[in-house]
């Protein structure tokens, strides 16, 4: 789980561009395919950016995240949207949805494929018939290892980012924050790389039809660092 300090840094350093970009592409994809969505759920919703985008476009939305810090920010951002603090592996909402999303490499935080399968089975149950499950996972070939890279939040606060593999082959993001040149804190976020073909196989095992598995959601908006997967409940 992310620390409360990291959640604040995540929000203030402007990392919202990831769900913002995905939200624009998702809405365009829905329009292009003439798909009408009335309700949506965002798994691992973070600070609620995608939920806010969906709500502003007339879709009744909800969100959940394992991090209490992320959900606290989401509730402050959009108090009218229902948010749950929960474990995605066990999560069972009280109602069904037309669309379920899970972006920002959230599934790469799930270490075991057995837990991924549990998530897929649960999503299948709380999707409406004909509903869509759209998510992304890391594209291993396009992950840029290296650093440290620096980012200035303001005149006094600076972030340092290092991306590396550990001895298990997992991809790690080390975030270190300084204020006035003095160390404040650091956090390491670990992700495991999942084979997209294995992931698609698990979806099919759980009853989904896999409509798309590519490095983009829209043809004109390629996103080389992620695989985008679109699945439909039959």
Where do the model's predicted regions map?
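C-terminal lobe and adjacent flexible extensions of AdoMet/dcAdoMet transferase-like proteins
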Residues: 198-234
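Nucleotide donor/acceptor-binding cores
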Residues: 37-39
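Conserved class I S-adenosyl-L-methionine
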Residues: 1-35
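A short beta-strand submotif of the Rossmann-like class I SAM-dependent methyltransferase core
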Residues: 102-104
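A short glycine-rich, Lys/Arg-flanked "PGG" loop and its adjoining helix->strand segment in the class I
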Residues: 117-129
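SAM-dependent methyltransferase
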Residues: 134-202
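A short acidic, Gly/Pro-enriched loop at the edge of an enzyme's catalytic core
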Residues: 92-99
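Class I SAM-dependent methyltransferase SAM/SAH-binding core
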Residues: 41, 48-90
């Amino acid at each position: 789980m992310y620390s409360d300090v990291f959640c604040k840094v995540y929000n203030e350093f402007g990392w919202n561009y990831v769900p913002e970009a995905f939200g624009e592409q998702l809405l365009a994809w829905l329009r292009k395919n003439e798909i009408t969505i009335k309700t949506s759920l965002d798994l691992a919703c973070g600070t609620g950016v995608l939920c806010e985008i969906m709500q502003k476009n007339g879709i009744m939305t909800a969100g959940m995240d394992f991090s209490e810090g992320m959900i606290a920010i989401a509730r402050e951002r959009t108090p009218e949207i229902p948010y749950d603090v929960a474990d995605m592996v066990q999560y069972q909402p009280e109602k069904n949805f037309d669309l379920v999303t899970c972006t920002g490499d959230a599934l790469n935080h799930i270490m075991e494929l057995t837990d991924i399968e549990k998530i897929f089975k649960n999503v299948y149950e709380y999707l409406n018939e004909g509903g869509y499950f759209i998510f992304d996972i890391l594209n291993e070939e396009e992950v840029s290892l290296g650093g440290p890279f620096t980012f200035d939040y303001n005149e006094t606060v600076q972030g340092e980012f290092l991306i590396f593999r550990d001895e298990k082959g997992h991809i790690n993001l080390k975030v270190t924050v300084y204020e006035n040149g003095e160390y404040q804190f650091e956090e390491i976020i670990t992700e495991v790389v999942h084979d997209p073909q294995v992931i698609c196989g698990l979806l099919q095992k759980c009853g989904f039809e896999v409509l798309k598995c590519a490095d983009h959601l829209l043809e004109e908006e390629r996103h080389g660092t992620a695989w985008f997967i679109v699945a439909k409940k039959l």
